A protein has these predicted regions:
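N-terminal hydrophobic targeting signals that begin at the initiator methionine
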Residues: 1-2
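C-terminal segment of classical bacterial N-terminal signal peptides
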Residues: 14-18
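Residues within mature, well-folded domains
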Residues: 19-101
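Sec-dependent N-terminal signal peptides
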Residues: 5-13
């Protein structure tokens, strides 16, 4: 039962983290729809083709899995990276990077 609650809380937090950037993307697109690339650069304070440094959340814990065989069944840390890439008139291609350390 406790495992189910942990999984449910993790899924709810993922939905919460995903909702913020999506709202910002819609606001950005409506604000910049008729702008030139130079106007977008002035609006953003940086070049619109520059990528934004991703935000990073780290889950530290351990769990086991027998899928990978002996010696690879325990994981201690998972990094979840939510990065945003931009082009001339877009904000927010969501990028999910999972790395097991």
């Amino acid at each position: 039962m406790q495992t189910h609650l942990l999984i449910l809380s993790f899924l709810l937090s993922c939905v919460t983290l995903h909702a913020g950037p999506a709202t910002e993307k819609v606001a950005f697109e409506s604000d910049t729809r008729g702008m030139t690339k130079e106007e977008v650069k002035e609006y953003m304070g940086r070049g619109p083709d520059e990528s934004i440094t991703p935000h990073l959340w780290r889950y530290s814990g351990s769990w086991t899995s027998t899928v990978f065989g002996e010696g690879m069944s325990t994981y201690n840390t998972v990094d979840i990276s939510f990065g945003m890439l931009t082009d001339s008139h877009k904000y927010g291609v969501m990028e999910y990077t999972w790395s097991i350390q």
